[in-house]
Amino acid sequence: MLITVYCVRRDLSEVTFSLEVDGDFELENFRALCELESGIPASETLIVYAERPLTNNQRSLASYGLKDGDVVILRQRETPEARPAAPFPGLDFSTIAVPGSSSQPAPSQPQAPPPPPPDTSSFPQGLDNPALLREMLLANPHELSLLKERNPPLAEALLSGDLEKFTKVLLEQQQERARREQERIRLYSADPFDLEAQAKIEEDIRQQNIEENMTIAMEEAPESFGQVVMLYINCKVNGYPVKAFVDSGAQMTIMSQACAERCHIMRLVDRRWAGIAKGVGTQKIIGRVHLAQVQIEGDFLPCSFSILEEQPMDMLLGLDMLKRHQCSIDLEKNVLVIGTTGTRTSFLPEGELPECARLAYGPGREEVRPEEIADRELAEVLQKSAEEADQQKP
């Protein structure tokens, strides 16, 4: 039978693993297997099943009622030598109020002792001294970068320079973690036939698997968390330069109204083809330009456009255009190959992309709207045309 073991160590670190054992397997041997998996000495383990500690090492697991698919809790016992005999160097414990220390613990209250161990076990790590912890993090760039990545709220409080704010956020997170830990232990100790408790345990295990999967991905494939720039090429429409987005997932080639006005092809728009373009969102189609000339490198290719009223990018080369001219996207050489002519054109680096397509455009650039970008580009084209006209004058 398969037994899932939820292990909580003395330092509050946790691990979950499964063991395949027989029903007549003795508890003593089961402890030994758990020691191999968790690293906790068998003499320090406390195994709990259905809110009942398993103490007789000579009894079999089946005699305790364990069956296939059950979950047991393994906790590391507190030992006298595990508790610090003297204050941790540099830390003052005299001002720390441990819950329940104001009065003598009564023997008839077995539930009172569990809360103090999590607090006292965390003291040696310096978490009881926010000022010291703050100095340690600021002095370690590697740990600080990890904190920014994995705990942005605490990193923000740390870099704010406000010790009181940092202390507040740190204590709130510690209290929340302790609350979740107590809730998790309560769930794993609940009645195994309680459907609600089992559903919460399943969700907790699922979240642990997600976190583990993300941690492995960050270590083994960190590049998967990066962003890539989209594929753009330089081209000309009606003689005017345009940066076109190559999108093999789009059904049709489209152009923004602002770009069509810059290229002076709005006069060719057939408004009988007006409609709604649906994809990730919806856009209003003003009409269609049935035939226009697109220049890619030295090739002049016929193309049709659907004109969209509000579109952040100037032009999008869709599958209709790509299949018509047998284009292929060569990511190894970073080029677009025109199959009918063999012409190759390179995809643009990020520095040459339109502002709306750069990775920097987004969270920190909301103040720049697509229509403002279009107006700016239109002004640049008009200025360039005026300069060329002045140069051609005798």
Curated annotation (Swiss-Prot):
Classification via Pfam families: Asp_protease (PF09668), Ddi2_HDD (PF24669), ubiquitin (PF00240)
Active site residues according to the UniProt entry: 247
Annotated region described as Disordered, given as residue ranges: 82-128
Protein biosynthesis listed as a keyword: no
Recorded superkingdom: Eukaryota
This enzyme's EC code(s): 3.4.23.-
InterPro entries (UniProt xref): DDI1_N, Peptidase_aspartic_DDI1-type, Peptidase_aspartic_dom_sf, Ubiquitin-like_dom, Ubiquitin-like_domsf
Pro residues biased stretches: 107-119
Any one Gene Ontology BP term: protein processing
Subcellular location: Cytoplasm, Cytosol; Chromosome
Principal localisation: cytoplasm
Record's GO cellular component terms: chromosome; cytosol
Disulphide bridges: none
GO molecular function, one term: identical protein binding
Keyword field: Aspartyl protease, Chromosome, Cytoplasm, Hydrolase, Protease
Domain Ubiquitin-like, chain residue ranges per copy: 1-81
PROSITE patterns noted in UniProt: UBIQUITIN_2 (PS50053)
Motif (Ubiquitin-binding): 371-390
Assembly and binders: Homodimer.
Annotated function: Aspartic protease that mediates the cleavage of NFE2L1/NRF1 at 'Leu-104', thereby promoting release of NFE2L1/NRF1 from the endoplasmic reticulum membrane. Ubiquitination of NFE2L1/NRF1 is a prerequisite for cleavage, suggesting that DDI2 specifically recognizes and binds ubiquitinated NFE2L1/NRF1. Seems to act as a proteasomal shuttle which links the proteasome and replication fork proteins like RTF2. Required for cellular survival following replication stress.
Family: Belongs to the DDI1 family.
Protein name (database record): Protein DDI1 homolog 2
Species of the source: Xenopus tropicalis
The encoding gene: ddi2
